[in-house]
């Protein structure tokens, strides 16, 4: 069912998404959709089960112009993560909480999407 869903999503994108540049798939496991441009409706396009959207940035500002509070984790490849993090902080972007390598977006730790999970999921009982 997931393979059919991915193929259906690819066909729908080919029909309706003017920003679509190309699509690649070697098997039904992974579909890669390359975008020509980043658009303001970027967060409405979500891949599932091995359906990925890709875009090669020319500069940070290109991404920053479409970032909203709905962004949480940005996966990247071939960039200096520290420089990118500094640029995110300098631009005062609300929405990018984690910058991780491709393949690490679902790794969870004590801090997740800008939240200290231990603190937020803990309860303190105090007796006076």
Q: Where in the sequence are the language-model features?
A:
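NAD(P)-dependent aldehyde/semialdehyde dehydrogenase
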Residues: 1-72, 85-94, 99-126
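A C-terminal functional module that forms or caps the active site or interfaces directly
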Residues: 78
């Amino acid at each position: 069912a997931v393979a059919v869903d991915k193929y259906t999503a690819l066909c729908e994108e080919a029909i309706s998404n003017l920003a679509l540049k190309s699509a690649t798939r070697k098997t039904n496991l992974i579909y890669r959709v390359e975008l020509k441009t980043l658009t303001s409706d970027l967060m409405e396009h979500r891949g599932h089960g091995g359906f990925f959207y890709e875009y090669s940035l020319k500069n940070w500002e290109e991404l920053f112009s479409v970032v909203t509070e709905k962004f949480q984790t940005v996966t990247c490849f071939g960039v200096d993560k520290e420089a990118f993090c500094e640029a995110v902080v300098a631009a005062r972007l609300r929405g990018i909480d984690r910058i991780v390598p491709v393949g690490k977006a679902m790794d969870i730790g004590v801090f997740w999407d800008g939240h200290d999970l231990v603190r937020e999921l803990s309860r303190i009982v105090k007796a006076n």
